[in-house]
Amino acid sequence: GIPCAESCVYIPCITAALGCSCKNKVCYRN
């Protein structure tokens, strides 16, 4: 539920390496 300051509209979350996932076009973590 914590925003990772990254969007995933056009490309996947680079922050996925930190445990972030795409939700509502924004990368979130927990």
Curated annotation (Swiss-Prot):
Pfam families in UniProt: Cyclotide
InterPro entries: Cyclotide, Cyclotide_bracelet_CS, Cyclotide_sf
Domain comment (free text): The presence of a 'disulfide through disulfide knot' structurally defines this protein as a knottin.
Organism of origin: Melicytus dentatus (Tree violet)
Disulfide bonds: C4-C20, C8-C22, C13-C27
Cross-link annotation Cyclopeptide (Gly-Asn), location: G1-N30
Family to which the UniProt record says this protein belongs: Belongs to the cyclotide family. Bracelet subfamily.
Function text: Probably participates in a plant defense mechanism.
Post-translational modification: This is a cyclic peptide.
Gene Ontology biological process: defense response
Oxidoreductase listed as a keyword: no
Name the UniProt record assigns to this protein: Cyclotide mden-G
Keywords, alphabetical: Disulfide bond, Plant defense
UniProt entry tagged with the keyword Disulfide bond: yes
